[in-house]
Amino acid sequence: MNIISKFICVLFIYIFAVAVYSQDESRASRTWSVQKYDITASLPQSENDRYLNVRAILSLKNVGSGAASRLTLRISPNAEVSAVKINDAAAEFTKGEEKIGTATLQRVILRTPSVQSNGNLLISVDYKLKVDENSGLSAISPVGVQFLPLSFWYPTPNSWYFARGADFAPLRLQVNAPNGQTVVSSGALTANAFDQKLNVQPFFITGNWDTITTSNVSMLIPKGMSDDAQKRANELAVLANEAKTFTAGLLGAAADIPLRIIAVRRGAGFSGGGTIFVDDNVFRRQKIDSQTVMTIAESIAKMWLGNIATVGGDGFGVIREGLSRYIATQFIESKYGKEIADIERLRQRTAYAAIVKRDSPLTIVSPLDDYYFPAVTNKGAMIWRILEKKIGREEFYNALRSSMKDGDLQLSELRSAFSAQKPFLDYAFEQVTDMNLLVGLPQPVGGETKVALRNVGSIEAQVNVTATTAIGENLSAQTTIPAKGFGEAVFRTNNKIVRTEVDKDKLYPQTEYSDDTAPRQFDESDAILVIKRAFDKQDYATAEKNARTVLQTSPRLDDARIFLARALSAQGKTAEAEKEFQSVLNENLPTARSIAWANVGLGEINLKNGQLANALKYFDQAVKADAEYGATLASRQGRNKASNLATIEEGIKNFFAQFDKAAVSNRKTEVQSLLLSGEVAKFAAGLSGQTEQWQTKVLQVDKFDDNNILVETNLNVKLLNREPESGTAIFRLTKIGNNYKLSGVEMFEVR
C-alpha cells in the first residue's frame, strides 16, 4: 500500500469514528432529570413593558451512572439571566449558544459540587424574558399573556429537542398578574398558585373569560359570546368527560385531575396536565368539528401517557403521540361509529403517506425532523392498531397498565412486554417503511376467481382482500402474503368481479396506497389532492367524477363531498349541489373547512334564487366558522352582495379616521399608538415612511366577544414608488378601556 493509499485509509477511519461519536453524542443519555419546577413569574405593569420577570427553582436528580459536576440549562436566547444559586449559594455561570436546526437556544453552564448518581441538586435562576412580537408560543399584551413550553421561557436541562424526551415534572407555578386578568395553568389552584402533582412542562395563559363548569369540566370562553357558544361549551365538556371515562377504562383510573378547556386566539391544539387549548372560533360555529374532537380526545389520553406516567427514551414519541392518537381514534369510534373513525384513519394515513419516502426509523426520529409528528403520530397509531389486533385487546391493555404502574413508560419496556411480536416490532420501530401491497386484476378460472397479490416489504402481511362483483355483491378473503413474496386470494363465485382491494382495513403503513385496488383509481395516495387538482384547474366535470369515485368507497368523507358539491354548483347543477352541501352540514363530525364551504355554497345558491334572508344566514355562518382563508373571503363577498352596508359604531369610524391620518403622517409613533402592544409590528413597519395615500371605508363589523371585533373594510392606498391599490382588508380591533387598538390583520386582499 503506498503512502497516499495509507493516508486515505487513515482519514476514512478517522471520519467514520468522528461520525459515530457525533451520532452517539446527539443521542446521549440524560444526566440530570427535573424532579419539580417551582416558578414565580411577574407580568408587566405597563403596556410598553415587554419583559416577563421570573424566578425558577429546579429540583434536580442525577440519573446518570456516575458522579456529575457540570450542569447545562437550556432557555430562550431572549432571556437575560441575572443570578444563579446552587443549593441556596450564589454561583458563577457562563453562557453559550446551542443551534437547534434553524433555531437557537441559550445555554447556562454551571460547575456544581460533585453529585453522586441518584443525588439531588437545587438550582435557582433569576432572569427576565423579552417578547418583541407576540406569537402563539409567547405573548405579552394588556389583554392577555401566554407562555407555552416551546417558547423555552423556563430553564431546564433537557429541551423539547432532546432525542430521548424533554423534561416533565410536577410543578408549582405562581403568576403575579395585573388586576382583571385571570391566570390559568394546569393542576389545582391553591393560595394564588397552581399546584400540579402530575408530570408536565410549565405553561400559563392569562385573559378575560366567562367560566362555565359542566360535568366537572371548566370551560373558559371569551366574555359576552352568544348562547350558541355556551351550547358548544357544554358539548365539549361532555365530550371531555366521556373521553376521560373511556381512557380510564383502558389505562386505569386517573387521579382527580381538574379538566379545563380554554378558548384561545393562538396556540390551539396545545395541552398539558388536563388543560386544553381550543380555537376560539370553535364556539362561534354551528357544530363541533372533527379536529377539535381529536384534539380533546388526544389531550385526555396524554394525561395518562406523559403526565401520570412519564414517557421517555428512544422512540418516546411513538407512545406520547402515536398511542395517544390510537386511543383517541378508538374513542371516536365508540362515540361516533366505525365509519367516522375510518375517516379519521384515512386522514392519518394520508398525512403519513406524504412523508413516508423521507421517513426515519421511529426509534431515532427526532423532534428536529420536520416529518416528526406525521411519522410518530400517524405511523405510530397504525403500529399500535396492528399490535392490538395480533395479540387481542385485553392482553394489549393489560400489558400497558402493568408497564405504567411504576410511573414510567418507555418503548423498550413495551417491546419487552410484547416480546412474542419481536419480528414485527423490530421492523415497525427500527426500519423505515418499505412495505407496498399490490393487487392484480381478477382472473376467472372455472367457477372461481383468483387474484394475485404481492408484498415488497420486509415482513409478512396478514390481510383482508375484498372483491366487488358486477351485481354489487361484496366478498372477502383472509390471506397472508409473505415478506418480499407473492400470494393469492380465491373467490368462489360465478359472478364477474369488477374490483378488488388488498388490506381493506388499511392496517399496514405502506410506501404507496394507490395500488391497493384494481383497477387502480388514481396514481397517488392522496385522493383529495387528485380532486382538488382538477377543481383548481376549473375542470369541474373531472373533479365531480373523481369525487364520486372516492365517495363510493368512503361515503362519509366530507372533504370529498364538499368538492363534489362545489363542482356541481360550478356546473350549474344547483339542486344536486344543494343536496350535497346540506349532507355535509348533516354529518356527525365534519371538518371546520367543510362546515365553512357548505355554508358558502348554500349561501350562493340562495343568493342566486333571490332568497336574500337565507343567503345572509348561511354567509354569516361561514364568516363565523373562519376555517379557511378562501371560504372566509367568499362568504364575505357573498354577504356584501346580499345585504346593504351595516350601521357602524362611531367609535369604530373614529378609530379608522385616526389610523388613516397616522398612516399618511409617516410617523412611526403615531401608528404605534393605535396598535395593541406586541401585535402587527411587521404590518406597521411596512407603512412607516412609505404611505402617500391611505383611505379606509368600513363595510361590515362582526362582534367576536365583548372586547374583540372583526372589521371588514375597503382600502384605497398608494405607497411610495408603487401604483395605487385597492381591495378588501379585515382588521381585528380590541377594546382597551374605552378605546380600540388594532390587534390583527386577518385578511389583506389589496392589489
Regions found by a protein language model. Give the residues of each.
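N-terminal, polar/Ser/Thr-rich
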Residues: 20-53, 422-423, 561, 599-602
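Juxtacatalytic substrate-recognition/specificity segment
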Residues: 56, 173, 210-317, 323, ...
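Extended, low-hydrophobicity, Ser/Thr/Pro/Gly-biased non-transmembrane segments
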Residues: 57, 108, 113-116, 120-209
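A surface-exposed beta-strand-loop module
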Residues: 78-143, 485-496
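Beta-strand-rich binding/interaction modules
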Residues: 82-85, 421-425, 437-504
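Acidic/His/Gly-enriched intrinsically disordered linker/tail segments
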Residues: 315-382, 386, 390, 404
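Amphipathic alpha-helical substructures
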Residues: 365-366, 373-445
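Exposed beta-sheet edge and beta->alpha loop/turn motif
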Residues: 470, 482, 611-612, 688, ...
